[in-house]
């Protein structure tokens, strides 16, 4: 029986090139990095170098489920991108637009509470204590005028 090859595979609302290896294909999903993609593939029992276009629809659904709920597949909690969620207190793994929306809400909450980090985000300044005397300067440089002859 010959395997059917798909040139485009849809995983987690994202179209992925079927020629990519499993490891590289999963990293193209926002919220899934190299380490998490390797862990998901190994826990699901696939080969890292297999082309993603050769997977059946059931295998793709299983991969998608592993990406959405990595704790079910014995992925350690330190690999999950939203540990101890602010509202629920549980560990979640967010991908694509859910991740972007959650980060935006976090920034808005910091701005609303007028925390130090929130104020720095509002002003467009560095948040993590970097020096600002010479770096993070915005706008055009004044430059030097050339001497007239």
UniProtKB/Swiss-Prot annotation:
Presence of the UniProt keyword Ribosomal protein in the record: yes
Keywords assigned by UniProt, alphabetized: Ribonucleoprotein, Ribosomal protein, RNA-binding, rRNA-binding
GO molecular function annotation: rRNA binding; structural constituent of ribosome
One Pfam family this sequence matches: Ribosomal_S13
InterPro entries: Rbsml_uS13_C (IPR027437), Ribosomal_uS13 (IPR001892), Ribosomal_uS13-like_H2TH (IPR010979), Ribosomal_uS13_archaeal (IPR019977), Ribosomal_uS13_CS (IPR018269)
Annotated region (Disordered), positions in chain: 118-149
GO cellular component entries: cytosol; small ribosomal subunit
Summary of the function given for this chain in its UniProt record: Located at the top of the head of the 30S subunit, it contacts several helices of the 16S rRNA. In the 70S ribosome it contacts the 23S rRNA (bridge B1a) and protein L5 of the 50S subunit (bridge B1b), connecting the 2 subunits; these bridges are implicated in subunit movement.
HAMAP family to which the protein is assigned, alphabetical: Ribosomal_uS13
Quaternary structure annotation from Swiss-Prot or TrEMBL: Part of the 30S ribosomal subunit. Forms a loose heterodimer with protein S19. Forms two bridges to the 50S subunit in the 70S ribosome.
Protein name: Small ribosomal subunit protein uS13
